[in-house]
């Protein structure tokens, strides 16, 4: 690594409650490299949060919203070049390229360390380096892990306070020699003496780098979301998935929900959907009219850490403490519980500002306000939008909100032992081919379903079908190691649990997005998805029927509870049918994925594909 140029070392100001000599030495090393003006150890207190928010209001990064409309809430607007995750600048720097696999960007770790050494040398000059200790998962949980992020962004500090268990209490768990994941983040915009800062500092050069063997994360150049809040995708999925591979557990891009039947029986379900497929909506589902007595509760909306428990079953926690959700499309109609969560103590990013100091985004209301300030600080009216197509909120605009504020939060959401998972659900956005719901006949077939799932990336244009992007397990951008090894890890975990006599969770594949000949969605979705969920739970109890398909088991029309919904057998046929020519084409697409991953692909997957083909020919 480049030798830092000689400067007077900054005072570390280590609080007396920090007893971890390895952590202190690491902070000292990074401070010597990045040369901040000062080092601040974050305690996670409300006073600290309020002070940093006020500092950002004064600096133009955030504005305080009308307290009568949104108590203790703020709006931040980013630089237009820094609005989303940057997959092409995200690297897995494993020692061996084949351990990253063909679906990840790999770079040689030593060369990357030299590159980052140059970029981080003096990167925090003129700024404060914040030491942000955080726990992913309830403090002290056997499933939780600790991280420490060093960042020069106060925006990161306040978001991490909502998204994780952050602050002084983490050091009590860490003690003098506890393990932690070291995370280094800089916006990459040092300030010369007397240089005026900007509202949203960032750098056109961006790197989001993971070292799986040493469990390190380094992020440079972005202040936004998953690039900068390193506990989220970087730690909770990319690094944690490699920890899970090595230690026999799973880190998954999954919501976790509880479902209680009218008789009081409670089930727990984990579900993986790629982005824009309704994960948060499903996590906060409200059962529809006609399904009285059923109750859905939210444990997590995005990430699940899943470990075998002493009882042999898989137990899951939500490692996060908040929601970092996409705002556009969220409304009282689509997600009542999310809207109720956003009434206070929220940080909004890149949404629009109303004239009375509140927020708005596309899809929040049927009729937009007559005038707004858009996410780039410009006047916006419906007429301007009609003329230019300009959105008031950025399509990836976000809210950061405390999970505890969600009306549907599950009483077990902070149980350190986690909740026992009864079923896994995998789903993508497909306008054709994939049925509304299918149950895998066994664990291997379920892993095959999840490994080959995909979503359409482009809207159908001039009758053209959307391009299907394979997104295995909804983990394509987030798996920290070779995807074939990841499939193998799932298969081995299933075998290991079966050998102990444990009951494995059932695996289901869903698709809410089949379209009819008119190009419209056939299935009503949202709360009505409860009907599909109820069928799955009936299958677990041996109470619901099903029909063998070439690809798993699906319900017949009479197996679904239609109380309160007019949905004809013809419509049901449109969403459940298996079109054999379409499936032959689908299997050819599966082959493309398997060819890409051939070097380490577990043989169970091509064998399962052959079995499907045989059933189609029968």
From Swiss-Prot:
The lineage of its organism: Bacteria, Pseudomonadati, Pseudomonadota, Betaproteobacteria, Burkholderiales. GTP binds at residues 276-281, 398, 429, 526-529. PANTHER family: PHOSPHOENOLPYRUVATE CARBOXYKINASE (PTHR11561), PHOSPHOENOLPYRUVATE CARBOXYKINASE [GTP]-RELATED (PTHR11561:SF0). One of its GO terms (molecular function) is manganese ion binding. The gene is pckG. GO terms for biological process: cellular response to glucose stimulus; gluconeogenesis; glycerol biosynthetic process from pyruvate; oxaloacetate metabolic process; propionate catabolic process; response to lipid; response to starvation. This is Phosphoenolpyruvate carboxykinase [GTP]. One of its GO terms (cellular component) is cytosol. Belongs to the phosphoenolpyruvate carboxykinase [GTP] family.
